[in-house]
């Protein structure tokens, strides 16, 4: 029995429907627009993180002076803002024109290059004044172009400077933390100066940490010592990685994810920054969104109901922890790598634009309210996140899963009972499980045939998030059939 109370015990900001759209330079492409359009239409995402892609903007003119071409950048941001998205912008990467260092270019992708044959430049600028000027010119341009709405966005300096893939690849990211951090602090200081010359109010932050906790501590202490402005702290958190999954050292686990979250929080508190909001501008049940089943067979969970159950359990744990979290952004970094439909990349849609269960979980999460109500739950393995609107409506998310999301779990029927009288109100029940809103499982049951023609239509239809049932309540309870890794949403209106 699950009993849903009527009293709001805490308020939770609507921060869960956010993503990193990757690669940023797919925003101007038809396939990228198709995904973005659908996210906006379904209300699955309201805030998007993109790279500024300063390497597409800054160049040298014939006299060797810095010059700027904002047209491609404008195309991207115009499109995103036209659909009403709020933006988080990472000022990255380093334009080739301000660093003379040879090497230091990486793909951070399955392929030898990034999207459209590009490479990531992780070398520091030769002259930080030029980096500052580029940050100033970019901020000035978008502040003038988009006006007051920019003040609701967030800007941060670079991406994952603590690891070799993104910054100063010649330095060991575990043994040479201090040297790497000192260089990044220079980058951050001039980023803040450049932004503030153009805009006095937009929120600025860093470091968009990947995983090196010592780097985070070094950075925060450096910010304090240098007296630098910082309005929020950006960190990335992944529950595990493919290498640990392959070795059996770790399994999928929200507890492991929350341990990594709290490791970051403890450093933030230790360094005296507990007053600042936290922006988790990348998350995933596993890192390496550009890896798939070729590198790690367990990554096939990304195609299944497991990923949606993980998401619901994770946001419940974050809600319970009452952290100063302002953004939670799933990173969709496998989108451009696909050559088949179901291979385990970290994205919302397959190659043929078939919705995955994780996408549908985001659609359901968008229906949650800001008021979290009391709840009694004595069902083993069941996570319940009950919310209430200021108009008295309810939206209750549930996930039934073991800690490691194993399929070996008893199938049960449980009753969700509301303490408030809901008779005559409209009840709608949505479900994601092995048989509902799950194209991959349907394809498996069909014998994994070649995906083409009519089958694409069938799988797209299966991927649509439709109510399992909708009815006028005649009692204050709803019965649910719980199967392994099932997700439910119950709304009362």
Residue ranges, per PLM feature:
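Mature N-terminal, pre-catalytic/accessory segment of carbohydrate-active enzymes
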Residues: 1-44, 484
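Carbohydrate-binding surface patches
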Residues: 379-445, 484-491
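Short, acidic/polar
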Residues: 26-40, 137, 141, 214-223, ...
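Substrate-binding cleft and catalytic face of glycoside hydrolase catalytic domains
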Residues: 43-252, 288
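C-terminal beta-strand-rich structural cap/linker in extracellular carbohydrate-active enzymes
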Residues: 450-493
């Amino acid at each position: 029995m699950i009993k849903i109370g009527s009293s709001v015990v805490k308020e939770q900001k609507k921060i869960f429907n956010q993503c990193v759209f990757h690669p940023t330079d797919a925003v101007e492409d038809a396939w990228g627009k198709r995904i973005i359009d659908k996210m906006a239409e379904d209300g699955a995402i309201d805030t998007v993180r993109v790279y500024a892609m300063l390497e597409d903007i800054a160049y040298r003119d014939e006299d060797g002076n810095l010059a700027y071409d904002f047209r491609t950048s404008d195309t991207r941001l115009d499109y995103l803002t036209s659909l009403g998205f709020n933006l988080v912008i990472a000022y990255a990467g380093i334009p080739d024109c301000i660093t003379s260092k040879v090497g230091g270019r990486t793909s951070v992708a399955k392929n030898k290059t990034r999207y459209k044959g590009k490479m990531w430049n992780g070398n520091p600028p030769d002259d930080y004044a030029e980096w500052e000027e580029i940050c100033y010119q970019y901020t000035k341009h978008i502040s003038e172009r988009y006006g007051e709405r920019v003040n609701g966005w967030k800007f941060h300096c670079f991406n994952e400077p603590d690891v070799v893939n993104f910054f100063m690849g010649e330095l060991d990211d575990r043994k040479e933390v201090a040297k790497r951090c000192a260089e990044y602090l220079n980058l951050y200081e001039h980023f803040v100066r450049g932004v503030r010359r153009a805009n006095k109010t937009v929120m600025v932050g860093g470091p968009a940490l990947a995983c090196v906790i010592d780097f985070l501590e070094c950075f925060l202490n450096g910010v304090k010592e240098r007296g630098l402005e910082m309005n929020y702290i950006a960190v990335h958190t992944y529950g595990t990685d493919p290498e640990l999954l392959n070795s059996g050292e770790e399994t999928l686990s929200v507890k492991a994810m929350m341990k990594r979250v709290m490791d970051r929080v403890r450093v933030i508190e230790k360094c005296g920054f507990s007053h600042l909001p936290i922006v988790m501008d990348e998350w995933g049940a596993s890192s390496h969104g550009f890896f798939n089943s070729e590198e790690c067979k367990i990554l096939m969970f990304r195609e299944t109901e497991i990923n949606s159950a993980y998401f619901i359990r994770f946001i419940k744990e974050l809600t319970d922890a009452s952290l100063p979290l302002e953004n939670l952004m799933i990173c969709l970094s496998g989108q451009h790598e696909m050559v088949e439909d179901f291979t385990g990349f970290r994205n919302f849609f397959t190659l043929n634009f078939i919705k995955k269960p994780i996408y549908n979980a985001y659609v359901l999460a968008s229906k949650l309210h800001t008021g979290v109500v009391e709840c009694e739950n004595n069902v083993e393995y069941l996570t319940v996140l009950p919310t209430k609107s200021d108009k008295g409506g309810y939206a209750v998310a549930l996930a039934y899963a073991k800690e490691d999301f194993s399929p070996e779990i008893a199938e049960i029927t449980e009753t969700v009972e509301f303490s408030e009288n809901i008779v005559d109100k409209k009840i709608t029940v949505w479900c994601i499980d092995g048989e509902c809103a799950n194209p991959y499982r349907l394809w498996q049951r069909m014998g994994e045939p070649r995906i083409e023609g009519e089958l694409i239509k069938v799988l797209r239809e299966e991927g649509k998030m439709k109510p399992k049932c909708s009815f006028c309540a005649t009692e204050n309870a709803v019965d649910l059939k719980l199967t392994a890794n099932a997700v439910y949403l119950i709304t009362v209106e």
